[in-house]
Amino acid sequence: MTLAAYKEKMKELPLVSLFCSCFLADPLNKSSYKYEADTVDLNWCVISDMEVIELNKCTSGQSFEVILKPPSFDGVPEFNASLPRRRDPSLEEIQKKLEAAEERRKYQEAELLKHLAEKREHEREVIQKAIEENNNFIKMAKEKLAQKMESNKENREAHLAAMLERLQEKDKHAEEVRKNKELKEEASR
């Protein structure tokens, strides 16, 4: 990157000093950055894990590419060394784990049996309720049918009695007409 490009970039980004201060190795010993019109201090911001490359410069602005280098593990202790080594479980620990697993299995089995018993009881209650409702329906249907049959019987008997009464009245009327006719015939003779 050229000095002119870096200088123009510093004018565009006033927060670059804050950005650079995050990567400084020893920020307390560095003096604060003072911007001067024609000079840029390239040593002020030392960034070891980053590289800035100018890609394009035109009248509308500039473009840069920031390449982050992979972190180095120099001076970092090994990860595996800090972990305590697993010891082999003793026979007693294995036995305790097996007993705990057996207890869990028995508990789960008991819970399952309890759940199934509750479900079976609920099904039994539902069936009993359905049987009671069916019996009540049958009883009500029989009562309604008996009432209907009784009503039909009473209506039929009343209808027959009315017909019989009308027939008797007709017979009576016919008898009266016959008697009147006979009386007229006897009177005319």
Swiss-Prot record:
InterPro entries (alphabetical): Stathmin_CS, Stathmin_fam, Stathmin_sf
Organism this protein belongs to: Homo sapiens
SUPFAM superfamilies, A to Z: Stathmin
Disulfide linkage: none
Superkingdom to which the source organism belongs: Eukaryota
PANTHER family on file: STATHMIN, STATHMIN-4
Cited function: Exhibits microtubule-destabilizing activity.
Localization in the cell: Golgi apparatus; Cell projection, Growth cone; Cell projection, Axon
Family membership: Belongs to the stathmin family.
Pfam families given in the database record: Stathmin (PF00836)
Segments of this protein annotated with the region Disordered: 168-189
GO molecular function: tubulin binding
Phosphoserine: residues carrying this PTM: 90
Protein name: Stathmin-4
